[in-house]
């Protein structure tokens, strides 16, 4: 996951992360959407979510996740921003539900 540059947006994103932390083992932030998505594709990461990146930030990673058999979707945040997220197919539904419960997507 990554965070926006606007401080008010970061505070909202931080609240989502705070809700997620007790429900996952760890959160890792590599700093590149495409590299995070490659981690999902290779199985070293269980999921990826980020609010507001541009298509050029994640497009290559999306192709790699889908080629590896994973699932990638773009949801919407409560603020109306795009929220790309991905996970292995067998885990995607549960991951997406968790993202909704934690306020990442509506």
Question: Would you name each region that the model predicts?
Answer:
Residues 1-106:
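An extended, acidic
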